[in-house]
A protein has these predicted regions:
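Active-site neighborhoods and metal-handling regions in enzymes and metal-associated proteins
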Residues: 1-132
Length: 132
């Protein structure tokens, strides 16, 4: 199920900045997905973006994975050297979680084509702020 983020009570500036970082990470990683690329290279890109922003210690899971009969299949977007192939159904799901502050995760499902990543999920990545 795709994951999207909402801020309740307006969100602090740190939470809003964190959301912008995760969204940028998602967008840059999606743009880097092409047939023949190693999943590990996309993962390294995500680690660099988040690490350069000072949040590397709070990004402790994989970036995404293949989906098939099982929800977690190859290729993996982590430290593995799985090759991304045309027709692979994958998730892209960067997330950063800060104790005492909150967490942000954006997750989409899609397929790898000759031209890159084509998302199945069409939910906008706009941040929804709910004032209570």
């Amino acid at each position: 199920m795709p994951a999207h983020t909402m801020a309740v009570m307006g969100g602090t500036q740190e939470q809003l900045d964190l959301y912008a970082l995760v969204r940028r990470t998602h967008e840059e990683c999606v743009a880097a997905i092409h047939p023949g690329v190693e999943g590990n290279d996309i993962f390294k890109l995500s680690k660099k973006i988040i690490g350069d922003a000072g949040y590397g210690d709070y990004y402790n899971h994989g970036l995404g994975h293949g989906v098939g009969i099982d929800i977690h299949e190859l290729p993996n977007f982590n430290r593995s050297k799985n090759i991304i192939e045309v027709g692979s159904v994958i998730t892209m799901e960067p997330g950063v979680y800060l104790p005492g502050v909150g967490g942000v995760r954006l997750e989409d499902y899609g397929v790898v084509t000759e031209n890159g990543y084509e998302p199945f999920t069409k939910t906008p990545h706009d941040l929804h702020v709910i004032d209570c």
